[in-house]
Amino acid sequence: MINSLLTRVFGSRNERQLRQLNRLVTQINALEPTIEKLSDAELQAKTPEFKQRLAAGESLDKILPEAFAVCREASRRVLGMRHYDVQLIGGMVLHLGKIAEMRTGEGKTLVATLPVYLNALEGQGVHVVTVNDYLARRDAAQMGKLYNWLGLSVGVVYPGMPHSDKHAAYAADITYGTNNEFGFDYLRDNMALSRADRYQRKLHYAIVDEVDSILIDEARTPLIISGPADESPELYIRVNRIVPQLTKQESEEGEGDYWIDEKGKQVHLSEAGMGHAEELLLQAGILENADDGLYAAQNLSVVHHLNAALRAHAIYQRDVDYIVRDGEVVIVDEFTGRTLSGRRWSDGLHQAVEAKEGVPVQRENQTLASITFQNLFRMYKKLSGMTGTADTEAYEFQSIYGLEVVVIPTNRPTVRKDHPDQVFLNRKGKFNAVLADIEDCAKRGQPVLVGTTSIETSEMLSEHLRKAGVKHEVLNAKQHEREATIVANAGQPGAVTIATNMAGRGTDIVLGGSLEAEYHVLGEDATEEARFKIKTDWQRRHDAVKAAGGLHIIGTERHESRRIDNQLRGRAGRQGDPGSSRFYLSLEDNLMRIFASDWVQKAMRMMGMKEDDVIEDRLVSRQIEKAQRKVEAHNFDIRKNLLDFDDVNNDQRKVIYAQRDDLLDAESVKDNVDGIRGDVIYDLVARFVPPNSVDEQWDLQGLEATLESELGMPLALRELAKTQEELDAEQIAAKVQTAVDAHFAEKEAAVGADTMRALEKHVMLTVLDQGWKEHLAKMDYLRQGIYLRGYAQKQPKQEYKKEAFELFSEMLENVKREVINLLARVRIRSEEEVAELEEQERRQAEARLLASQFQHQDAGGYGADEEVEQMQGGNAPVPVSQVTRDEPKVGRNDPCPCGSGKKYKHCHGQLS
């Protein structure tokens, strides 16, 4: 009550922030008459002037009003577009490192030019992150005219571009690209074998377009660079023949071999199913010994393949989750409906789907590098974003990224009419109503956009419309090459456009069609008369569409997130235009079937509803929204769970990448090698001759054999012990250390100091990379089974953290030992041979990258769903970690980032 009273008196936090920013808008507007009087040359000279003022100590906030006024005037002259006052507010919100929620059609692309220009003046690089390559190139080309005119350089990064072009793009003041490309380039940079092979500078400032899509929808799927493993794909094909012989249970307690957990996207074998599967696998010769059982240690690989095959057959559907194109299985993005060419599911799922579809099965992949979007974007010194729908996820943005959402008012009032949902008994009744609504709109000349949740639904609707003689366009994963053209024409009178989910985001649907697109077809040489005719025709169509009611949105199914539904609705009613929306639902829709309360379904059946009967009731709509909230909470738990696990990996990743940076920057790593050699030899001797031990406890024969096999150094330690009666463990350790040091000194004298320095650096880098790759594979295996610890009354996250630390420590010890072993045994005659070795390794690394896959991993691989369900209310709440934007270098006396409590130099800094 007190809160609501205070809000009425002082306004909400959002309103208070808008009032503060409006004061700055007044300052910017006051500067406009002065800025307008400047010549082009004087206006362009403002950029170097701002840079000098920043260099002299002025802050960005101090020069913001004048810089925004300059950018607005330059935009008017170059692009013919002047920023509205609400767009100035949006630009300030982005500069402050917050999220600006702006409705569709409010000009987010133009808004971004203000903070991009201001922050690019610092010369440390600004990244503008988009959802697809088309938008990155389009915005870089369009807005690049403005930035170039103002004296700033612009680059765009995209997959497959030449190395030199990518270097130049990242060196530019402003770089456009997709979230995936920025993420993969970060990982590639940390696999580079020399400084010259790296692209990115320090991650300074990023503006994320469609921030909800990138930081929330895609946050469940880590970015992974993986290469083919050695295992043959034949087992996937053999196991695939088994699965169709297993029967599905209708419920967890019903009869059959397996049941499906649709919420968690998992398949579980029943007791009977395990026995039946074992029998079938034995008959197929896949299991060799009937006494061992399916879950014997030697059969775990078979279990992995069987689980993947069950998920491929029972959960993943063709033309919904993937399509088959040119003999390949191509993933369909569940949020945008776009195909993700070149991406592969991990954990054997992609191979299982390939076997199911009868296309060539490619080898399973091994992780080479990975990172989540949460940890990637939290590395930026300053992060901001913009979208039409963020307020429903404000808590997640704040708790995970430290980003506040500010809702920006529209330039003109929204007049779109959102009709109540219509709920039908089954899908047939629902689609009959959808088709009737489409035909009615087409007859009246009202354009309609139909949103579907799958390719299958869009093609089914398309077939019905074709039979009814209704002209239409389909925009889904199979047609996304024509995406911009289809969306540009979706506002024509009577146009019918069927779109999978939110494909086509980033391009406004203009009532009457896109005037700019028609001008573009005319060309720059067109006469004024021709342009006038085009404008007159467009205005006539525009007025006709407005009279018919504007764009009508039809949703054929509620998405599991209210935000995605709001995005679809938001395509209509842009900039004060008329528009309308309606969702058609049925009890057979996934959301209703899995999550909606049973009483809704029972009530509708008890009322004797027929196929074409419809319910329009606010109570039902509230139940649907309640179901969506349940799913949103469930998905937030999954994303939070994923982040908790990846934070462990991230601490280790930071240590390894920091050490790689030190190695790449160092002129010489001799001191590192000398320190490592002392540690390795001490540990080696201690294994066979423990400190402070007596000679009866020594194993000199084992020590001699190990020195010869690992270091290539024969030492007669037993003879030494016979001749020196007073010899103790410390003296033996000193003798071995002296001999090894002499061996390394001889090697250096033979090849020269420069050659030895180059060799040491090359070996340390190569061994560290190989050790990290093998460690990632072990972490994958650990993560996949860690949730089972919950059954033993242990906290999986704590167990994961503890065992991950042990694996990491073991990996670093192995790396140190391998570095010394290699340096002791390698035979190099000249510096040219080292250079040739480095060049060969670089070529192999490039070949591995070309052969590698850039993919999103299914979040289920983290055991996320299982653990979330087990831990609800069972674990102590996990505190939200403070978001750290900037990552200072870890000092040698600082606490180690791994969390051991030791100093960095005594823990994971020992390798440095």
From Swiss-Prot:
One of its GO terms (cellular component) is cell envelope Sec protein transport complex. Part of the Sec protein translocase complex. Interacts with the SecYEG preprotein conducting channel. Has a central role in coupling the hydrolysis of ATP to the transfer of proteins into and across the cell membrane, serving both as a receptor for the preprotein-SecB complex and as an ATP-driven molecular motor driving the stepwise translocation of polypeptide chains across the membrane. This is Protein translocase subunit SecA. Residues 902-912 have a biased composition (Basic residues). Its EC number is 7.4.2.8. Keywords: ATP-binding, Cell inner membrane, Cell membrane, Cytoplasm, Membrane, Metal-binding, Nucleotide-binding, Protein transport, Translocase, Translocation, Transport, Zinc. Zn(2+) binds at residues 896, 898, 907-908. ATP binds at residues 87, 105-109, 508. Its cofactor is Zn(2+). The gene is secA. GO terms for biological process: intracellular protein transmembrane transport; protein import; protein targeting; protein transport by the Sec complex. Monomer and homodimer. Part of the essential Sec protein translocation apparatus which comprises SecA, SecYEG and auxiliary proteins SecDF-YajC and YidC. The lineage of its organism: Bacteria, Pseudomonadati, Pseudomonadota, Gammaproteobacteria, Lysobacterales. Belongs to the SecA family. Transmembrane segments: none annotated. Residues 855-912 are annotated as: Disordered. It is found in: Cell inner membrane; Cytoplasm. May bind 1 zinc ion per subunit. It is a peripheral membrane protein. SUPFAM superfamilies: Helical scaffold and wing domains of SecA, P-loop containing nucleoside triphosphate hydrolases, Pre-protein crosslinking domain of SecA. GO terms for molecular function: ATP binding; metal ion binding; protein-exporting ATPase activity.
